[in-house]
Each structure stands twice: as structure tokens, then as C-alpha cells.
Amino acid sequence: MKSSPNQLSIFSYLLGICSLDTLLSPVGRKMDAISPLVILRMDNHISSFFSEFQPNGQAPISSTDKQVTPQVSHDGQVLEFAPPRRLKTEEIPNIVDDFRIAARNAIEAGFDGVEIHGANGYLIDQFMKDSVNDRTDAYGGGIENRCRFAAEVITAVAGEIGAHRLGVRLSPFADYMDCHDSDPEVLALRVIGLMNNLGVLYCHMIEPRMCVGAGEDGSKPVIAHGRLLPFRKAFRGTFMVNGGYDRDEGDKAVADGYADLVAYGRLFLANPDLPERFRRKAGLNKYDRSTFYTSDPVVGYTDYPFLDDQNSELATR
């Protein structure tokens, strides 16, 4: 199952995924990335609340059967969500195995690592957070039970590909798709404890306050460092932060020891050579939010210019 149309899957399409890895790996090396590492983000492939994206129009699965509250998109469109189907207890091991198989396929395709997406209202988040999880079986109730699915997925993937190839993304403070928790600090520390025991390579955590990116409306993002510091101190591996950072804020986070790495999303989407632009302190392309999550293979994805292309164009004018 998919959470959006035209979403890339890695259950059987290994030849296409191999081609993607072959294409992307030299780019990482050319831009002097931290390592020639191409991370396959393991999005929750079965969390969609849009039944039209599911095989034969079947209901999307979840920890619950509660329907997501209608939401207004950035363009003013009201999104109605299909009622999900609550997973039966006996079905859950098969879902855990889906994550394991996808991770194995990623490594066989040539990727160096896998990131499990346990954030932003996807399936793992739906199990962990008490605003959604209303189960009465071994996967619901107290925090240990609510984290059981996450623990099983992380353990299975680590056992399949090695914890040294594995990262986990968490958003304890976020409220996506009605997913929020009454005690996010305790929840995140619980998962981090599991990750420490397994020796997971990195923890990728989203800031509690998603800031407006620089260049979107002329404002400069201001990030109140500190909310993620307890998790940074608790996690024994590499700690990565994300959420509205620009170059200066990212440098500060690393220099202050607040994080080991800073992840960029929207800025990277609009600037395919973002590391080089940061290195030169060059200007950035402005991203176009209206093209986010579209199915067009070019517009909004591969049509943003490289810095050298822009300089060459200016030189010929």
C-alpha cells in the first residue's frame, strides 16, 4: 500500500531502485557528503488515509479505526480522509516483516542504509501516540505496549541489515494526522532507550516548532534550541535534527553541540547543490510549495537550477 500516488516502493522493483542508487551515489561523492551514503527513507508504506491509493480501494490500515479530522491543505483545499481499518493483533507480525523485507531489498539494491520513518503521523507514530492508539491488546494502553510495534520494527530491521546501517526518525512533539501524545518526552526517551540497546546508528528528530523556512516570506527562521537537548544527551549514537533550519542556524546547532548533523528538506528540494551553496555562502533558489507532493516527474523536483548553471547564464547575458 502507498501513502501517496506514484510513491516509490521497494518490495519488488529492485531493478529500478538499483538504477536510482547508481545515479545518486556519485552525486553524494561529488558534493563531498559526509560519506558516499544514500539513505533510503523507509516511509510507512501502509499508513495512507486515502483509500484510492490502496489496492482495490480497500481501507487503509492503522492502530485504530478512528477517522482523521478533515484538514485544510496549503492551497485551501479541504481534505477528507477515508476511515481506516484497525489492524488485528495477528496481522501485525506480517506488517513488521514488510519493513524487514523492504530494508533488505534496499541494501540488496546497493543503498548504504535505511531510515525508518517513525514520525509525522505515519503508521509507527499511530501506534506510539495516545491520541490515536485506543487499542486494548498488547499494542495499546500503557507506553510499553504503545511502543511495542516500533520496537518490533526497529529490532527486525536491525537484525536484517545491521544496526550500523539503520537510522530512525521521530517527531515526539508533532501533531500530524491527529497524532500527538500527552507525554512526548517520556515517549521519545522510551524509544531512544530501545535504539541504544540495539546500537542504532543515528536518531533523526524533528524540532517541536516547525519554523518558516528562510526565503519563503522573507523571514528568517528562529529556532529555540533546547527542547531536543534531553534526547541528544540520552542517545548514544549520532543525533540529527530537522525543522526550519537555515545555514547559520545549522552551523550553530552543531557548533554548540546541540546536534551532530542537521537535515534539510525544503531547501534541499529547491537547491540540488545545497552543500556547495552553503560552502560558498551563495544565494538559494526559493522553493515553490505548490509543487510539493506532485506526481510530475520534473516540475518541482528536477527543474531547480544548479548554482554553476545560474552563474553561466548570468555570464552570457
Curated annotation (Swiss-Prot):
Cofactor(s) essential for the protein: FMN
GO biological process assignments: fatty acid biosynthetic process; oxylipin biosynthetic process
Stored InterPro entries: Aldolase_TIM, OxRdtase_FMN_N, Oye-like
Pfam families with a match to the protein in the record: Oxidored_FMN
Binding-site residues for FMN, renumbered to this chain: 26-28, 169, 244, 265-266
Molecular function, one GO term: FMN binding
Signal peptide from the UniProt entry: none
Enzyme Commission code(s) on record: 1.3.1.-
Active site: 122 (proton donor)
Record family assignment: Belongs to the NADH:flavin oxidoreductase/NADH oxidase family.
PANTHER family (alphabetical): 12-OXOPHYTODIENOATE REDUCTASE 10-RELATED, NADH OXIDOREDUCTASE-RELATED
Entry function: Putative oxophytodienoate reductase that may be involved in the biosynthesis or metabolism of oxylipin signaling molecules.
Name assigned to this protein: Putative 12-oxophytodienoate reductase 10
Organism expressing this protein natively: Oryza sativa subsp. japonica (Rice)
Gene responsible for this protein: OPR10
